[in-house]
């Protein structure tokens, strides 16, 4: 351990293979030499430092992640450690040590044989996804980049959210890479560069919900404007009252369109599933369903998991006041 309480990654973890590379840096599968050689996932991030050392925002974000870890929520990936690799006057290389899960939702969907994911499995996975998201939101943590690649699926079908609450930690690394972050799961308010909060994650959930049925993305745009156009082709052009006022792109830039039946794009979805999907894919974030409300949606009424006490994994609301609201 160093004086800042962070471990030295090169002393405890032995890299086995590189398992991913994205906008945020490289991800390695490694052995934890101090814990029986268990496999972990190492995410390496470069953080810009100044005369005062590591930015307060980064320290705060790490503190939030460590606080969330104390709850050991079943639908949130475990954060075992935060380590430093090396330091210079300009940057510190952080290594975030997470539990290792062999596959993400993208891999899972690719492997599923015809005719696709059973509807009851989709329902179960959606419930777990929403339960993990509600936990994050109850701590005022917005995921911001929810997509199948950072939803992990264990061999027993357990869903775990990964890569949440890391936007500030990753911001410096993102400036150094040319990797394009996918637009396909981004909410309209993000594409329009409007202000946003927790509802952005529910839009992403809607896109992922549809993809579980389709096994391919619902909206596949090539730019912010193209992505928005593809969204409006399906859900229709919203009224003037629902268009955000703090954006440069006016509603008039898009042709007037009516909403198309969602079952045209998402076959095999039942009426209750369709209702939940449309509540997630609501253009106006103020009218979009919350994760907490979605857990009580009639779509889940026949799911055995719903009989469990949802509050058993939720922190007391009064404990969120000291947490990061960014």
From Swiss-Prot:
Residues with the Phosphothreonine modification: 49, 70, 177, 325
Residues reported to bind ATP: 19-27, 43
EC number, as in UniProt: 2.7.11.22
Domain of life: Eukaryota
Molecular function via GO: ATP binding; cyclin binding; cyclin-dependent protein serine/threonine kinase activity; FBXO family protein binding; protein serine kinase activity
The reaction(s) this protein catalyses: L-seryl-[protein] + ATP = O-phospho-L-seryl-[protein] + ADP + H(+); L-threonyl-[protein] + ATP = O-phospho-L-threonyl-[protein] + ADP + H(+)
InterPro entries the record matches: CDK, CDK6, Kinase-like_dom_sf, Prot_kinase_dom, Protein_kinase_ATP_BS, Ser/Thr_kinase_AS
PTM annotation (N-acetylmethionine): residues: 1
UniProt modification remark: Thr-177 phosphorylation and Tyr-24 dephosphorylation promotes kinase activity.
Protein's UniProt name: Cyclin-dependent kinase 6
């Amino acid at each position: 351990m160093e004086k800042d309480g962070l471990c030295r990654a090169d002393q405890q973890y032995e890299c086995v293979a590189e398992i991913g590379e994205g906008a945020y840096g490289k991800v390695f599968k490694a052995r934890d030499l101090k814990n029986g050689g268990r496999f972990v996932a190492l995410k390496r991030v470069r953080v810009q430092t100044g005369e005062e050392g590591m930015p307060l925002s980064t320290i705060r974000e790490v503190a939030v992640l460590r606080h969330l870890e104390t709850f050991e929520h079943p639908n949130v990936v475990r954060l075992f450690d935060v380590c430093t690799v090396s330091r210079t006057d300009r940057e510190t290389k952080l290594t975030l040590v997470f539990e290792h899960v062999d596959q993400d939702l993208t891999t899972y969907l690719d492997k599923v044989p015809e005719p696709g994911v059973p509807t009851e499995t989709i329902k179960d996975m959606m419930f777990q996804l929403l339960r993990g998201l509600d936990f994050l939101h109850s701590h005022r943590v917005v995921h911001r980049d929810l997509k199948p690649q950072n939803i992990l699926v264990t061999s027993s079908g357990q869903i775990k959210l990964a890569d949440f609450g890391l936007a500030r930690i990753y911001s410096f690394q993102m400036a150094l890479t040319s990797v394009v972050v996918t637009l396909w799961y981004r909410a309209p308010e993000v594409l329009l560069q409007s202000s946003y909060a927790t509802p952005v994650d529910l839009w992403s959930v809607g896109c992922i919900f549809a993809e579980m049925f389709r096994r391919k993305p619902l909206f596949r745009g090539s730019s912010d404007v193209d992505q928005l156009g593809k969204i409006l082709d399906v859900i229709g052009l919203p009224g003037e009252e629902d268009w955000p006022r703090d954006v440069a792109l006016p509603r008039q830039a898009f042709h007037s369109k009516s909403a198309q039946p969602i079952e045209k794009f998402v076959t095999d979805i039942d009426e209750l599933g369709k209702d939940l999907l449309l509540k997630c894919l609501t253009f106006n974030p103020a009218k979009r369903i919350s994760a907490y409300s979605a857990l009580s949606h009639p779509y889940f009424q026949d799911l055995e998991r719903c009989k469990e006490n949802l509050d058993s994994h939720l922190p007391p609301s009064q404990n969120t006041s000291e947490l990061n609201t960014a």
